[in-house]
Amino acid sequence: MKYQIAIIGGGPAGYTAAEAAGKAGLSVVLFEKRSLGGVCLNEGCIPTKTLLYSAKVYDYAKHASKYAVNVPEASFDLGKIVARKSKVVRKLVLGIKAKLTAHQVHIVTGEATIVDKNTIQCGGETYECENLLLCTGSETFIPPIPGVENVDYWTHRDALDNKEVPASLTIVGGGVIGMEFASFFTSLGVQVTVVEMLDEILGGMDKELSAMLRAEYAKKGIKFLLSTKVVEAVSYTHLTLPTT
């Protein structure tokens, strides 16, 4: 099988390039080892916003009396919230697949191996190409905390699919993803602590805005440990922090 363009990685860069090439009439093969859409659609922006919307509705229901609406004993089902999130993601993934298929892009699910600049192997098949485009994205960064390899910690992927409400949760890192999960689990009644090595959360944002957001999160009950590094991961429920 020979194609004018082979693309490895079906995230936003890969599938957009594949669609554009297909529209231009080129023969295209796209390799993706997980799901089309990449991290943002499957494990990032879209699923977290879907979870947060469910949490927002639950918050409204709990405080509905403020708006002269009676909602007795508002409750939630985390399993169904996660199922709804997965349904939304699947629908969007299918939408991407339909667009690519409409432009004759050949989609191959599996981990591709580059043999040389014009040859790729995947799933026991060999594919030849005139041009090769790499859009492989990124991997989850696990901070080099001593002992972390012996701890059954969560990554964002685990948090997205978790169906049991923990009593408490410590989040190492106060960036965008960390704060999204902090907000979500706090809304469900979980005691959340955010450990951040910088002097403010959301380091890439304006500091005044970050401080305002932190104050709002604190009102919801989130505890913050700023300018704090995790010294050691002892167990699933025990982190060692510096004493100051």
Annotate each PLM feature.
Residues 164-197, 204-205:
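Rossmann-like NAD(P)H-binding beta-loop-alpha module
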Residues 5-29, 181-186:
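N-terminal Rossmann-like FAD-binding beta1-loop-alpha1 element of flavoenzymes
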Residues 15, 141-142, 178:
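Short glycine-rich, flexible loops that bind phosphorylated cofactors or substrates
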